[in-house]
Amino acid sequence: MDYYRKYAAIILITLSVFLHILHSLPDGEFTAEECPECKLKENKYFSRLGSPIYQCMGCCFSRAYPTPLRSQKTMLVPKNVTSESTCCVAKAYTKATVMGNIRVENHTECHCSTCYHHKF
């Protein structure tokens, strides 16, 4: 009888550890090592029944390469590495009012283009 209690306890502990690990994994958004492609995704915070709000999400490319010597000579502060990247941004959008008086952009089309947050 004591043997079965130990066996049951081990099974329950193993099951609880497995469920804890399973529960701690993300909900499938970024489970792959690679980032998903740039596309529209519903914004669950601003969306309401019958009036979904979409935003562009995903990854585009970025790369770094050695700066050509002739380009380094023209720089005020020469840098050995030049980087280039694009971000997932809205190609087209409409203005929408949510929660009474908050104006947001409801993205309708996405593409990879200049990263706007770098332009401040």
UniProtKB/Swiss-Prot annotation:
InterPro entries: Cystine-knot_cytokine (IPR029034), Glyco_hormone (IPR000476). Keywords: Disulfide bond, Glycoprotein, Hormone, Secreted, Signal. One of its GO terms (biological process) is G protein-coupled receptor signaling pathway. Disulfide bonds join 35-59, 38-88, 56-110, 60-112, 87-115. It is found in: Secreted. PROSITE patterns: GLYCO_HORMONE_ALPHA_1 (PS00779), GLYCO_HORMONE_ALPHA_2 (PS00780), GLYCO_HORMONE_ALPHA_3 (PS50277). Its main location: secreted. One of its GO terms (molecular function) is follicle-stimulating hormone activity. Pfam families: Hormone_6. It comes from the Eukaryota. Glycans are attached at residues 80, 106. One of its GO terms (cellular component) is follicle-stimulating hormone complex. Residues 1-24 form the signal peptide. Heterodimer. The active hormones thyrotropin, lutropin, follitropin and choriogonadotropin are heterodimers composed of CGA, a common alpha chain described here and a unique beta chain which confers their biological specificity to the hormones: TSHB for thyrotropin, LHB for lutropin, FSHB for follitropin and choriogonadotropin subunit beta/CGB for choriogonadotropin. Shared alpha chain of the active heterodimeric glycoprotein hormones thyrotropin/thyroid stimulating hormone/TSH, lutropin/luteinizing hormone/LH, follitropin/follicle stimulating hormone/FSH and choriogonadotropin/CG. These hormones bind specific receptors on target cells that in turn activate downstream signaling pathways. Belongs to the glycoprotein hormones subunit alpha family. This is Glycoprotein hormones alpha chain. The gene is CGA.
